[in-house]
């Protein structure tokens, strides 16, 4: 019998009306703004009324360094949420929205997989409720107003060479990384060099995901630094009077999206910054709403714990005042073998020796999460090629690192395949969490970058030229020294070289560029060759996506 694809499983799901899902959380129908029958936004008025309620337990799902195909972190997040509900706990899932770039590129969608999916899967992986389009429009409105201001006399005296605000689109397109705009003569403005980033790297995306409410959203938008004058003094979004119009475009996008899992459990899907080039977490407003409505909230942070979890702890939890109760590190036998030196085409063959070598990567991530004072458990996301000897080797290694490991079959079995992990998470969440960020607010910006590099990546030093160091000092003098840092680097390694696997020690982290995200409230350090506008692979997933003769989508995964 052929194995069903994710899209076939999702289509066969028996979805409940979204009002019924909301009612299970105590959300009245009038507080929902429906987008069809199976998805809705939760109104701001209802969310404001939740203030004062006690919070549930916050559970983070993170992972080891992934293979290019991902290791099922979202699948495990969904499965764990279903598993908690299965054992009688009131649980909600909080995940990010999907970007079109990876969907048509290499990684695929962001709705989970197998029997642990959020539905409607096709909508979620495409336009969903239009949030990303609103973010793209708001971002590019500001870009248009910058060039328009210069065209009509440049009263703010913006230096065209020092405009830092680029344009965005939600697609992988390397051709747009560096562009020249305003060509074509006097009628089109003053030519200047700029470029595009992918929408998920936009500061507007980060602002939407970190803002408390609409008022905070507009205030943060106004704080965006768009560029500098000749005397190097900053020009803000509020100086261009753009923040109000941007907030109008984002008004509906600020409301969290409610959907359901295949097993009809509630899921908030809202926001979608990448963890390698941004802070990698779903929105604060969705997480806070879920914490007021459920006893357990299961959320994820992008890629491995060196990126997503570190930013979840040091940026999201710090800025939003959140305190996680437990963390799950997702590992797969195939990724551990890859970290142990096995080629991608050989990952289906048993190799316990390589697996044990690769387990050093798992150990590093366990230690890093423990370093934040959060209790840890390991989820072994099962693949059919795993052998019993390999699974036992992972269990034994994790136990030696002080973390229990559970084999999870949620992809194939749904919540029934992850009950043991759910029980353990409940147990861990009842133990005291000694959560604390990695560094204090008052540490200098460059020292914060060094702290992340040395303690999380185990680097020997951070390489940054005097221009970067001077820029950081200038920002500190301007009052931005207390901001956390957001390290943008490859997700495949603790180094900036994607080919170096395992748990390397003593390497250097080169910082190529720094960017001030004053509205979001952090400083970005772009490390190595990471790009904020990805490119498509030689054989993009888009080549396999099409409509069948009945108009149904095929090839989406």
UniProtKB/Swiss-Prot annotation:
EC number: 6.3.4.3
Reactions the enzyme catalyzes: (6S)-5,6,7,8-tetrahydrofolate + formate + ATP = (6R)-10-formyltetrahydrofolate + ADP + phosphate
Molecular-function GO terms, alphabetical: ATP binding; formate-tetrahydrofolate ligase activity
Organism: Cereibacter sphaeroides (strain ATCC 17023 / DSM 158 / JCM 6121 / CCUG 31486 / LMG 2827 / NBRC 12203 / NCIMB 8253 / ATH 2.4.1.)
Functional pathway: One-carbon metabolism; tetrahydrofolate interconversion
Record gene name: fhs
Family: Belongs to the formate--tetrahydrofolate ligase family.
Binding site for ATP: 67-74
Transmembrane segments: none
Lineage, broadest ranks: Bacteria, Pseudomonadati, Pseudomonadota, Alphaproteobacteria, Rhodobacterales
Keywords associated with the record: ATP-binding, Ligase, Nucleotide-binding, One-carbon metabolism
Name the record gives this protein: Formate--tetrahydrofolate ligase
GO BP, sorted A to Z: tetrahydrofolate interconversion
Signal peptide: none
């Amino acid at each position: 019998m052929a194995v069903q694809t994710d899209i076939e499983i999702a289509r066969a799901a028996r979805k409940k009306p979204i009002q019924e899902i909301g009612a299970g959380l105590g959300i009245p129908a009038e507080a929902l703004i429906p987008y069809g029958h199976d998805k809705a936004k939760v109104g701001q008025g209802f969310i404001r009324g939740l203030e004062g309620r006690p919070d549930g337990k916050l559970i983070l799902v993170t992972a080891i360094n992934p293979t290019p195909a991902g290791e099922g972190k979202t699948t495990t997040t969904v499965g764990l949420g279903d598993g908690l509900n299965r054992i009688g706990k009131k649980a909600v899932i909080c995940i990010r929205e999907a970007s079109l770039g990876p969907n048509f590129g290499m990684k695929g969608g962001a709705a989970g997989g197998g029997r642990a999916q959020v539905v409607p899967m096709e909508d979620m992986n495409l336009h969903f409720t239009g949030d990303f389009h609103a973010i793209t429009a708001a971002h590019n409105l500001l870009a248009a107003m910058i060039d328009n201001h210069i065209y009509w006399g440049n009263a703010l005296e913006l230096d065209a060479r020092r405009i830092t605000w680029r344009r965005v689109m939600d697609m992988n397109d390397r051709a747009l990384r560096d562009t020249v705009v305003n060509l074509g003569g006097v009628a089109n403005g003053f030519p200047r060099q700029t470029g595009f980033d992918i929408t998920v790297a936009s500061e507007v995306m980060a602002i939407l995901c970190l803002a408390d409410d609409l008022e905070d959203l507009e205030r943060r938008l106004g704080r965006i630094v768009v560029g500098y004058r000749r005397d190097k003094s900053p020009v803000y979004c509020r100086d261009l009077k753009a923040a109000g119009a941007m907030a109008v475009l984002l008004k509906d996008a600020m409301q969290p999206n409610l959907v359901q899992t295949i097993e009809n459990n509630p899921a908030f899907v809202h926001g979608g910054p990448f963890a390698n080039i941004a802070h990698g977490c779903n929105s604060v407003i969705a997480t806070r709403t879920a914490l007021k409505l459920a006893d357990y909230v299961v959320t994820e942070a992008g890629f491995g714990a060196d990126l997503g979890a570190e930013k979840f702890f040091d940026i999201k939890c710090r800025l939003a005042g959140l305190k996680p109760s437990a963390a799950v590190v997702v590992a797969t036998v195939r990724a551990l073998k890859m970290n142990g030196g096995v080629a991608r085409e050989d990952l289906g063959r048993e190799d316990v020796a390589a697996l044990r070598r690769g387990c050093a990567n798992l150990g590093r991530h366990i230690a890093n999460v423990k370093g934040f004072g959060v209790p840890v458990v390991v989820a072994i996301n099962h693949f059919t090629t795993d052998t019993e000897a390999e699974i036992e080797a992972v269990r034994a290694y994790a136990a030696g690192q002080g973390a229990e490991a559970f084999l999870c079959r949620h992809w194939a079995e749904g919540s029934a395949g992850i009950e043991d992990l759910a029980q353990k998470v409940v147990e861990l969440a009842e133990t005291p969490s000694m959560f604390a960020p990695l560094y204090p607010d008052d540490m200098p910006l460059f020292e914060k970058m060094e702290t992340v590099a040395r303690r999380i990546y185990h680097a020997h030093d951070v390489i940054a030229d005097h221009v970067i160091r001077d820029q950081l000092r200038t920002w500190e003098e301007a009052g931005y020294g207390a901001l956390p840092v957001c390290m943008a680097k490859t997700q495949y390694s603790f180094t900036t070289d994607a080919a170096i696997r395992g748990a390397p020690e003593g390497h250097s982290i080169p910082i190529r560029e720094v960017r001030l995200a004053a509205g979001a409230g952090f400083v970005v350090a772009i490390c190595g060759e990471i790009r904020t506008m990805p490119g498509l692979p030689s054989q993009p997933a888009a080549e396999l996506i099409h409509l069948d003769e009945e108009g149904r989508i095929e090839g989406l995964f």
